[in-house]
Amino acid sequence: MEYSHVVYALLAVALAIIFVLKGGKPSLKPTKYQALLEGYLRFVRNMLLENVGERGLKYVPLIAAIGLFVFFGNILGMVPGFEAPTANINTNLALALLVFFYYHFEGFRENGLAYLKHFMGPIPLMAPFFFVVEVISHIARPITLSLRLFANMKAGALLLLTLVSLVIKNPFTLVVSPVVLIFVIAIKFLAIFIQTYIFMILSVVYIAGAVAHEEH
């Protein structure tokens, strides 16, 4: 299906919402979903405190939502017959552009036109040069952010597909395939967590840089 990534992206959103609803449901006895959600939100909160400071706490919902979407999007690729929406460049680029426009919006909102000083560099005479370099650097951010996630998820999906195909075509590989398959799945899960973290931390770093106030 040409737009299958949209369907899987919506499914990832649905899974994230279900997780939040189950984890946020009041209960006298804390459930595993509550523990997971609270631990995750604490992790996001600490990430923002370390990189942005106290005023960064208002970004907890955004970063938490991004992390959940990327995580569940990645996880869908582990389900037989399913496709990870994050293995499609269009999904990742849309998410990266959301981060890109949002942190620039926050930069102007926090600093006004003084935000442009972030692009000028420390030497006034070199400001035009630094401005061009910074603009190119910022334009490259959503591209690299989306490509990194796409490449890792696509490569993992192709590797799993190749291993399954080998087992189907050659029954003799059944002797060693379980061990190899378990190893590959373990590596894939590790990659899922790492890539989710990278997308989140880079989003936080971009926001932190944008809302930082120029010292006078």
Swiss-Prot record:
Q: Where is it located? A: Cell inner membrane
Q: Which residues form a coiled coil?
A: none
Positions of transmembrane segments: 1-21, 62-82, 88-108, 119-139, 149-169, 174-194, 196-216
What GO CC annotations are associated with the protein?
Answer: plasma membrane; proton-transporting ATP synthase complex
Keyword match Transmembrane: yes
Keyword flag Secreted: no
| Chief site of localization | membrane
InterPro entries according to UniProt:
ATP_syn_F0_a_bact/chloroplast, ATP_synth_F0_asu, ATP_synth_F0_asu_AS, F0_ATP_A_sf
Membrane topology type: Multi-pass membrane protein
Which GO molecular function annotation, any one, does this entry have? proton-transporting ATP synthase activity, rotational mechanism
**What is one Gene Ontology biological process annotated in the Swiss-Prot or TrEMBL record?**
proton motive force-driven plasma membrane ATP synthesis
A Pfam family cross-referenced in the UniProt record is ATP-synt_A
- What keywords would UniProt list here? ATP synthesis, Cell inner membrane, Cell membrane, CF(0), Hydrogen ion transport, Ion transport, Membrane, Transmembrane, Transmembrane helix, Transport
Subunit organization:
F-type ATPases have 2 components, CF(1) - the catalytic core - and CF(0) - the membrane proton channel. CF(1) has five subunits: alpha(3), beta(3), gamma(1), delta(1), epsilon(1). CF(0) has three main subunits: a(1), b(2) and c(9-12). The alpha and beta chains form an alternating ring which encloses part of the gamma chain. CF(1) is attached to CF(0) by a central stalk formed by the gamma and epsilon chains, while a peripheral stalk is formed by the delta and b chains.
Q: What functional role does this protein have?
A: Key component of the proton channel; it plays a direct role in the translocation of protons across the membrane.
Question: Could you say which protein family the record assigns here?
Answer: Belongs to the ATPase A chain family.
Query: What protein name is recorded for this chain?
Result: ATP synthase subunit a
Organism of origin? Aquifex aeolicus (strain VF5)
Q: By which gene is this protein encoded?
A: atpB
